[in-house]
Amino acid sequence: MDIEFVRSRFIKHFDGKTGNIYASPGRINLIGEHTDYNGGFVFPGAVDCGIMAEVRPNGTNTIMCYSIDLKDRVEFKVDDPQGPHASWARYIYGIVQEMKKLGVDVKGFNTAFAGDVPLGAGMSSSAALESCFAYALNDLFGDNKVSKWDMVLAGQATEHNYCGVNCGLMDQFASVFGKEGCLMRLDCRSREFEYFPFKPVGYKLVLLNSCVKHELAGSPYNDRRNSCENVVKHIAAKHPEGKYETLRDCTWEQLEEVKAEVGEEDYKRAHFVLGEKDRVLAVCDALNAGDYETVGKKMFETHYGLSQEYEVSCEELDFLNDIAKENGVTGSRIMGGGFGGCTINLVKEELYDQFIADAKAKYSAKYGKEPKVIDVVIGDGSRKIC
C-alpha cells in the first residue's frame, strides 16, 4: 500500500492538513480449519497487504470517514445511538463504540483509508479494518493503554454487535499480533499463542482463488458444529468422570467407542477435527526443524479431510488441489470455511511458473475463467507508520 496515495486523498478531502497513518494486515491460515469452535488450534499469519488509514482529530464530536476505494463519504456523531447505514462505515462505528467501552475517550476525527486485501479471498479485510482503527484510536485518544488482546476482542465485538457476523477471534488476532517471518499457533480455548518461524527459502506461498462461492441449502456450518457437539455429548455420557466440553478433550480411542452410536456422518466430522489437531502440532514441529516437506504433506492431508470427511470442499477446489499434485507442489489445501474461495499452496520456486500456468490453463478450460493468483508474504501486524 502506497503511503503517499493515502495521504494525497486525505489532504484532498480534509482541508489540506495531514494526520497519522496506521496500517493493519489481512491474514492467511496455513493449517487448522474448523478447529476454533472445537477448542483446538489455528495457525494464522499476517500478510503484507491490508488496510491503511490516515487519521486526524478534528476537535468536534463528528467522525468523518472517506473510503478511497469506494469513493464514498460517511459522517456520524461519536455518541450516535444508531450509527451509519453504510456497511463499511459500521465497522468504524462499531470500533468507536467498543473502544469507548474500554475507557478510550474517543472524540471526532477525520479519516481516509484504502485497502489492498483481495476481496473474496478469505483474507479478512474486515478484521484488518477493525484492527487498524482500534490501533489508531488507542494511540490518538487512549494513550496506548488498551492491550492488544482487548483490541482483538473489540474487533470481534464489532462484528457481533454492529455487523451481524458471529465470528471467532482468529482474524483479528492475526491482524493485531502478526509478526514478519512468523506464523502463530493460537490455542482457541486458552488464548495462549506462540510464534513459529516461517521463512521458506526456495519456496513460495500462493493462493489460488477459485472465484466461486456455493450457496448451500440449510445451515452447513451449523450442521457440522452440531455433529461435533453430538460426538462430544456421547463421549461424555460414557465417561462421566471426565470433563468433555469440545472435541479438544476427546481421544481417538473414545471416538472409536461411540462410532456406532453417532453414525457415519458425525463420526467423519469428528475424525477430521481430531486429525486436524494433530496436524497443527506436527506442522509446528516441522517448522521448528525447517522441514517444509512435512508441512506440505500435512496441508494435503488437511485438504483430503476437508473434502472427504468434513465435506466442505467443492468441485472447483478439488480440481485446483489435483492440479497442485500433478505439478509437484509441496502442499495444497482449502483455506477458509469451504464451499468456494481459495486454495493455499506451498510450492518450490523452480516449479512456481509452470504450476501457475497449468492451473490457469486447465481451470479456464474447464470453468471458463482463470483462478486469481495471490502471492503471499508474511508481514507485521497492526502498527503506526508515521
Annotate each PLM feature:
Residues 128, 342-346:
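FabD-like malonyl-/acyl-CoA
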Residues 44-46, 54-57, 103:
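Short, charge-rich binding segments
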Residues 39-46, 224-225:
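Short Gly/aromatic-enriched secondary-structure transition segments
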Residues 111-113, 208-210, 343:
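A structural signal for short, well-ordered beta-strand segments
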Residues 1-22, 28-32, 37, 41, ...:
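Gly/Ser-rich oxyanion-binding loop with an adjacent helix/lid
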Residues 1-27, 52-85, 182-331, 346-386:
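C-terminal nucleotide
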Residues 339:
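Glycine-rich phosphate-binding loop
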